[in-house]
């Protein structure tokens, strides 16, 4: 029973991440510009995590100074920069396109791991990379019709995949020394402080005085940032990491469905095939982590 509860936590986390685009667009309609949306996601999340951990898990505040560069990298590149490029992508492309481009990240992790740790690049990994690249071509409109996003938006999407992939690299080093909650807290410590550089209070204050602004900000922080990280982390206590990664790929599905339901976005057969290809590539990579998955 405990195992199924852990699976449910992972699914909840992934579905919550799928709401990022919804609240991002709500903030945009309230007049919150891109710079301030980066601040709204990261700084309040840092403050909220600080309060939660101060009450329930104070040990996360204790790390060795020599390990701070790990958290600086994950916070400033993997979270803060990711927020900026991903939000830009979502404004230039459909939510489905933005989500699927983001999920090219596992393929990039394979390449980075091979370069950094000499991890073997097997036939299965090559097949997964090709599937992901085909999926990218399909969902972006390079294959099968007109582009479903601007070239600028597609570049932002690829950049978001790179930033997302770097979190796995930094986490490899961070989790070798600390638990998951400590990794999350210090990542958002630097992401939150770094996001102050994006704050334009004179422009943000009027937007936050509206119902749309408050609702969008609260949703982005609680539903699309803090809760998914806490749910996903809780789920990892009872689910093997590779399986959790596969389950978490319901995020692009959730984002696509939310785009259809809330924004009346159209899912062509090519976009659907692209989603299948990208997720198929991720599934191949995760399967290789099992004892019977070598190829």
Predicted regions and their residues:
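Helix-helix packing/entry segments at the starts of transmembrane helices
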Residues: 8, 40, 79, 83, ...
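Hydrophobic transmembrane alpha-helices of multi-pass small-molecule transport proteins
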Residues: 49, 72, 121-142, 195, ...
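Small-residue-rich packing faces within the transmembrane alpha-helices of Major Facilitator Superfamily
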Residues: 18, 43-47, 133, 189-193, ...
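Membrane-interface helix termini and inter-helical loops of multi-pass transporters
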Residues: 22-34, 60-61, 91, 140-152, ...
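Glycine-/small-residue-enriched transmembrane alpha-helix faces in small-molecule transporters
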Residues: 1-40, 146-173, 293-295
């Amino acid at each position: 029973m405990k195992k199924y509860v852990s699976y449910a936590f992972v699914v909840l986390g992934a579905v919550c991440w799928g709401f990022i685009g919804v609240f991002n667009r709500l903030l945009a309609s309230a007049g919150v510009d891109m710079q301030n949306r980066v601040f709204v996601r990261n700084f309040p999340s840092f403050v909220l995590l600080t309060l939660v951990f101060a009450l329930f898990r104070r040990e996360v505040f204790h790390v060795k100074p020599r390990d701070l560069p790990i958290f600086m990298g994950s916070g400033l590149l993997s979270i803060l920069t990711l927020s900026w490029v991903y939000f830009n992508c979502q404004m230039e492309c459909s939510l489905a396109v933005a989500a699927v481009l983001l999920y090219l990240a596992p393929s990039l992790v394979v390449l980075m791991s091979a370069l950094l740790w000499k991890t073997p690049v097997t036939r299965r990994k090559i097949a997964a990379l090709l599937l992901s690249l085909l999926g990218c071509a399909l969902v972006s409109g390079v294959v099968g019709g007109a582009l479903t996003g601007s070239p600028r938006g597609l570049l932002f999407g690829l950049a978001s995949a790179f930033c997302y992939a770097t979190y796995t690299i930094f986490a490899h080093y961070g989790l070798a020394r600390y638990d998951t909650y400590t990794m999350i807290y210090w990542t958002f410590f630097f992401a939150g402080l770094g996001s102050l550089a994006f704050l334009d209070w004179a422009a943000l204050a009027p937007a936050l005085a509206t119902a749309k602004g408050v609702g969008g900000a609260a949703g982005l922080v609680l539903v699309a940032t803090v809760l998914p990280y806490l749910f996903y982390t809780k789920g990892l206590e009872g689910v093997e990491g590779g399986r959790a990664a596969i389950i978490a790929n319901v995020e692009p599905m959730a984002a696509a469905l939310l785009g259809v339901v809330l924004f009346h976005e159209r899912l062509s057969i090519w976009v659907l095939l692209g989603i299948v290809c990208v997720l198929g590539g991720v599934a191949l990579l995760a399967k290789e982590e099992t004892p019977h998955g070598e190829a």
